């Protein structure tokens, strides 16, 4: 790591860089999943979700670039391979799975909420453990963006029953008496 004199030790900077690289990995997996759902969504909400997810993956792309640049600002190198992303990410892929539109939304809510929990922890650790208030502030902004996205996605499926796997439960059709 190059010698940088910004009021943080090499150990503090490396600790924050490690956190940022995990956030970068999770953001990349979420970007890929969001794009995949953008391509695969079908049904009556196609246009709404297709457009919403385009906005989301464009924002994720901006955030990924900002995270990588923050790593470089601190003298580190951002991970940049799928192997590296998969090793560091806390989010999981759903390879070969094409859920319903509601299932896609539910999966993305879970992923954004996981990222929010991770970012909340990383904000605290950046500030308290590593004394890097700049990165803590940066991560707070990212966390707030994910909170808003999760809220929008949750609002889309609010009131709809959803199984833990993101599917809607089968419902019985009841024929009215006398029909």
From Swiss-Prot:
Residues 160-179 are annotated as: Disordered. GO terms for molecular function: ferric iron binding; oxidoreductase activity, acting on metal ions. Pfam families: Ferritin. Residues 165-179 have a biased composition (Polar residues). InterPro entries: DPS_DNA-bd, DPS_DNA-bd_CS, Ferritin-like, Ferritin-like_SF, Ferritin_DPS_dom. It comes from the Bacteria. CDD domains: DPS. Belongs to the Dps family. This is Uncharacterized low temperature-induced protein all0458. It comes from Nostoc sp. (strain PCC 7120 / SAG 25.82 / UTEX 2576).
């Amino acid at each position: 790591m190059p010698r940088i004199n910004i009021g943080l030790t090499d150990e503090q900077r490396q600790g924050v860089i490690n956190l940022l690289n995990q956030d970068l990995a999770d953001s990349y997996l979420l970007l890929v999943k969001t794009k995949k759902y953008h391509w695969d969504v079908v049904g009556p909400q196609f246009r709404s979700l297709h457009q919403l997810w385009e906005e989301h993956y464009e924002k994720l792309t901006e955030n990924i670039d900002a995270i990588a640049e923050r790593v470089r600002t601190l003298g580190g190198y951002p991970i940049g391979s799928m192997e590296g992303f998969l090793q560091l990410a806390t989010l999981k892929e759903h390879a070969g799975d094409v859920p319903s539109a509601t299932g896609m939304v539910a999966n993305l809510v879970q992923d954004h909420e996981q990222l929010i929990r991770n970012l909340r922890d990383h904000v605290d650790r950046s500030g308290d453990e590593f004394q890097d208030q700049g990165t803590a502030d940066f991560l707070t902004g990212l966390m707030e963006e994910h909170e808003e996205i999760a809220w929008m996605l949750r609002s889309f499926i609010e009131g709809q029953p959803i199984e833990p796997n993101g599917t809607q439960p089968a419902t019985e059709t009841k024929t009215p008496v006398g029909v």
